[in-house]
Amino acid sequence: MATEGTTGSGSRVVAGMVCSLWLLVLGSSVLALEEVLLDTTGETSEIGWLTYPPGGWDEVSVLDDQRRLTRTFEACHVAGLPPGSGQDNWLQTHFVERRGAQRAHIRLHFSVRACSSLGVSGGTCRETFTLYYRQADEPDGPDSIAAWHLKRWTKVDTIAADESFPASSSSSSWAVGPHRTGQRVGLQLNVKERSFGPLTQRGFYVAFQDTGACLALVAVKLFSYTCPSVLRAFASFPETQASGAGGASLVAAVGTCVAHAEPEEDGVGGQAGGSPPRLHCNGEGRWMVAVGGCRCQPGHQPARGDKLCQACPEGSYKALAGNVPCSPCPARSHSPDPAAPVCPCLQGFYRASSDPPEAPCTGPPSAPRELWFEVQGSALMLHWRLPQELGGRGDLLFNVVCKECGGHGEPSSGGMCRRCRDEVHFDPRQRGLTESRVLVGGLRAHVPYILEVQAVNGVSELSPDPPQAAAINVSTSHEVPSAVPVMHQVSRAANSITVSWPQPEQTNGNILDYQLRYYDQAEDESHSFTMTSETNTATVTRLSPGHIYGFQVRARTAAGHGPYGGKVYFQTLPQGELSSQLPEKLSLVIGSILGALAFLLLAAITVLAVIFQRKRRGTGYTEQLQQYSSPGLGVKYYIDPSTYDDPCQAIRELAREVDPTYIKIEEVIGAGSFGEVRRGRLQPRGRREQAVAIQALWAGGAESLKMTFLGRAALLGQFQHPNILRLEGVVTKSRPVMVLTELMELGPLDSFLRQREGQFSSLQLVAMQRGVAAAMQYLSSFAFVHRALSARSVLVNSHLVCKVARLGHSPQGSSSLLRWAAPEVITHGKYTTSSDVWSFGILMWEVMSYGERPYWDMNEQEVLNAIEQEFRLPPPPGCPPGLHLLMLDTWQKDRARRPHFDQLVAAFDKMIRKPDTLQAEGGSGDRPSQALLNPVALDFPCLDSPQAWLSAIGLECYQDNFSKFGLSTFSDVAQLSLEDLPGLGITLAGHQKKLLHNIQLLQQHLRQPGSVEV
């Protein structure tokens, strides 16, 4: 009998075909391995399995279906048995070691005779047999062998043949298969496969039960499935036994990353430290359900698909773990060795800590160029140009080093100098400057300094060399004059502009002359021109017609030039227009003649207008004039858009149509009654880009709204003045309909002033009012009445130039404009230039009060009563008397006694030239004495502390200042003077004036009998 070791060898074969064990089948499976536990296929020697009862199964040698001799177990005891005789023949294998298998598979080769061919009737013949198994930790001993068939067996299945074969008629003994004369032929076989488990003990037995069949068991093969070892996703997975549960059950196998690989992060991306990869082996020995994987470490790239990670070659790198190829080294870097995670920079070049590895190496910048400065009293504005070489970076910054020197020396003679005192300060800061200028303050007069400007960037600290720098020797004097506060236009022509300005507020000596700098706004400011004037007036000639020019002026004393004042912009007249100032020497006779001719011509045109009025319905705008006169005689006119049936026709004649492709629309900056207002850019072909404000008409608006919208644009397009909002163009041929005007960055004048309370001198506020008055003088020359003049209808640009807007606004039904309305407007609805003068006076009060609401919180009826009783607004805190007197002139009840706008402009010019006139308190003998309104009086009995008093007057921001300096009673506050306020931290001029005004009221209250001190 052959031993079990010879029949159940541990050899392994690939199921189905001969192929590589490492073949990875994409899509989740690999061919399974069969771990053979027992195999009788082709066995020729005695097998020796146990049978019961003896003779129930016979072990014989027969030819198989390949005509090979093989050992076979046969059972066929149905012939000759009486009906009803039962069969119970058992065949048991030897003890089979499971060898780690969790489930066993059995493959049976057998043949069954057909009962019909045996001539057996009744139920004694079967064509099936039953398969069993039982587990054991040890082989059966001698005592157990005798009763093996009585042990507890587990049924696997009843095995039925797919085909049964007839009995051979020529064979005297039992035979299976067709008969050939003179020899035994090969068997015809069925093949069945079953599995059982899970297996938990050392081994098992398999048994076959025959209950009345005629069959031959030709071959038995017991095996288990194993998933082979594989390389997948840069990880190796070991050989793994299939699950004992079979079917879809899975066994997880943990993989090991190949050399120079690491587990992938559990999340998306990230560094090393993820869970090891896993594959799952199913019950048929096939890999599936991959979880995770490995990735090549920094400095390594994939090779042979996803099997290996190899080092990056010289001159390349890979900074992060991942399965991407290496990259060539960035500019100015090189990796001399393989497996580089980053390419080191070449000598003289660096990477900042914030630079990624893929960034090119960069260097420090070169030194700044062309340092120069402008002295501003004890301070100076230091300028420089950008370095020639930026080092390949965009994070350029500047540091300023200040050295105070004991004597005059070159910048290189640092041994004589020391670090500047702490009193020297820098605005906006000393280090990390982003712009090429800095204001240096706190310098001592007549002390030589060296200012050094260093250029640095993100890699300057990595360089062993100090930052490249440029230095300049500077010295300041307190005696230079201060800045000229304001400048205004006296007259203009097509090729010239005459400007005038007041003396600096601090002359610090005798003014020797003034230096005027000017440039064309259409060109770069660096192309500016200068001229010198010994007076405070200058005429600039050789200018281009219709161009806008920027002007600045500074004064010079023996100590040197003071700083330039702010930029102011004026425009020359278009070619062919008359000068804005008539020659002073014009003959009275010529003037009389021209006046007579103008009167006659006006009368003639008026008669013609009446005659043809009925015939002009729908005619061109050029025939419908608000005032009829000849422009050749210097009398101006404008066209009233409301007389047009089609506002688009007026737009075509009076405004420039803009191609929408030239417009770039940006963010929303506001909204009006017609639609949103957006910031934008306009760049017609061949012209410089300019910032504009774009108002688009609401979609779906009424036709009347569109007519009003376009009518206002047509009106605005007729006026060209530096202090009137400029129309840049319109879009009417596409949707939405848009109106483009110049951009006024600082918005309405009232809100602008409220946000900057106390930040301007009286002269600067006068200059703002002068600009508005000049615009109204220009409009009144056209007999145009604004009707809605107020601080909110005036816009301010970034150069503090005030421009009148909202032309054509209809105030009818708008009670909100009552506070600016003249008495005749309130009572009779009569709008004239004189009513605009009244409104301008209210605007003056708004300016001097920094945007305070006229008449404060009085309701409309109270305002009407006050005006009717001839009460007038009092001077705002800090308002010069001369300005308030001018306001009172504009508020004369008799409109004929109010000044004209040209008189107001002349008054402002006089104040600017001679600032002492602002303080003049004398009045005209013709001016009636007018009662002045007071703001809402403070309820002193309800104010229990200086802190409550500060809140009542709107200066609660200084409550901590009062507490810090022990101002706890009204008596303490009443003793404060102007000199005390800076020491309390109250430096804004407007706040100082407001506080002093209310201190005076407080003093009056404390002097009253019965007042209680708190």
UniProtKB/Swiss-Prot annotation:
Residues 663-912 form the Protein kinase domain. One of its GO terms (biological process) is positive regulation of T cell costimulation. High level in thymus, and brain. Very low levels of expression in kidney, lung, liver, bone marrow, skeletal muscle, spleen from 2 week old and adult mice, heart, testes and embryonic stem cells. The keyword Thylakoid does not apply. Glycans are attached at N473. Keywords: ATP-binding, Cell membrane, Glycoprotein, Membrane, Nucleotide-binding, Receptor, Repeat, Secreted, Signal, Transmembrane, Transmembrane helix. A motif (PDZ-binding) lies at residues 1012-1014. Residues 613-1014 are cytoplasmic. Residues 941-1005 form the SAM domain. GO terms for cellular component: cell surface; extracellular region; plasma membrane. GO terms for molecular function: ATP binding; ephrin receptor activity. Residues 1-32 form the signal peptide. It holds the Pfam family Ephrin_lbd. Ligand-binding increases phosphorylation on tyrosine residues. Phosphorylation on tyrosine residues is mediated by transphosphorylation by the catalytically active EPHB1 in a ligand-independent manner. Tyrosine phosphorylation of the receptor may act as a switch on the functional transition from cell adhesion/attraction to de-adhesion/repulsion. InterPro entries: Eph_TM, Ephrin_rcpt_lig-bd_dom, Ephrin_rcpt_TKs, FN3_dom, FN3_sf, Galactose-bd-like_sf, Ig-like_fold, Kinase-like_dom_sf. Residues 33-591 are extracellular. Residues 34-232 form the Eph LBD domain. Residues 364-479, 480-575 form the Fibronectin type-III domain. Belongs to the protein kinase superfamily. Tyr protein kinase family. Ephrin receptor subfamily. The protein kinase domain is predicted to be catalytically inactive. Its extracellular domain is capable of promoting cell adhesion and migration in response to low concentrations of ephrin-B2, but its cytoplasmic domain is essential for cell repulsion and inhibition of migration induced by high concentrations of ephrin-B2. Interacts with CBL and EPHB1. Interacts with FYN; this interaction takes place in a ligand-independent manner. Kinase-defective receptor for members of the ephrin-B family. Binds to ephrin-B1 and ephrin-B2. Modulates cell adhesion and migration by exerting both positive and negative effects upon stimulation with ephrin-B2. Inhibits JNK activation, T-cell receptor-induced IL-2 secretion and CD25 expression upon stimulation with ephrin-B2. This is Ephrin type-B receptor 6. It comes from Mus musculus.
